[in-house]
A protein has these predicted regions:
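Gly/Ser/Thr-rich phosphate-binding loop
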Residues: 2-68, 77
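Structured loop/turn residues at beta-strand edges in well-structured enzyme cores
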Residues: 7-10, 92, 129
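Active-site glycine-centered loops adjacent to acidic/histidine catalytic or metal-binding residues
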Residues: 19, 48, 70, 101, ...
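Short Gly/Pro-enriched turn/cap motifs at secondary-structure boundaries
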Residues: 67-72, 88, 118, 125-127
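Conserved beta-loop-beta connector loops within the AMP-binding
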Residues: 79-98, 117, 121, 139-140
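AMP-binding/adenylate-forming catalytic core of the ANL superfamily
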Residues: 101, 106-107, 117, 125-126, ...
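A short helix/loop element that forms part of the nucleotide-sugar donor recognition site in Leloir-type
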Residues: 112-116
Length: 172
């Protein structure tokens, strides 16, 4: 970008992104631009949503795992359930991300039905926010965003993740 041509980026202390899946090529390109302008930060991924005061997960320093949005922030709990249920899926399997903790909203203003669908009391007695986002979790507890349920494409009876299509496009 012409705006950054003469910029001194040595002042950057951190840089993070959490909008959607971050392709490795974009991460590397960003870090290269920062390095050429005197900076040394790594671009780390995180995850958040409005219903949970935005930032809920982040990648700890020097713990980069390609495709991961990190681990839950302190005082937050996360688990993966089979979509439409409260049943936890095995580690490594995909399912809907649920969150519990002090950052989770109390409900939607004047929308009790939507609140009841989104905030559910599970068998452990805690209120869990059903995010509508599909994730998987590694053995080490790192979470991997797959897609927003509302963005899933159905093609010939198969579920296709937009990120799969985007990954192919990024290679070309």
């Amino acid at each position: 970008s012409p705006i950054l041509e003469d910029a001194d980026l040595s002042c950057l202390l951190s840089a993070s992104v959490g909008a959607d899946t971050l392709p490795r090529t974009v991460k590397e390109r960003f870090e290269d631009v920062v390095r050429r302008r005197g900076g040394s930060v790594q671009l780390v991924e995180g995850y958040g949503l409005t219903e949970a005061v935005t930032g809920i997960m982040t990648t700890p320093a020097d713990s980069y795992r390609e495709g991961s949005v990190g681990i839950p922030c302190p005082d937050m709990e996360a688990k993966i359930v089979a979509p439409g249920t409260q049943d936890t899926v095995p580690v490594g399997e995909e399912g809907e991300l649920c969150l519990s903790g002090p950052a989770v909203m109390l409900g939607y203003l004047e929308a009790p039905e939507e609140t009841a669908q989104t905030l559910q009391r599970h068998a452990d007695g805690k209120i869990w926010l059903h995010t509508g986002d599909i994730f998987s979790m590694s053995e080490e507890g790192f979470f991997y965003f797959k897609l927003r349920l509302k963005r899933m494409i159905k093609s010939s009876g198969m579920n296709v993740y937009p990120a799969q299509v985007e990954a192919v496009l990024y290679r070309h």
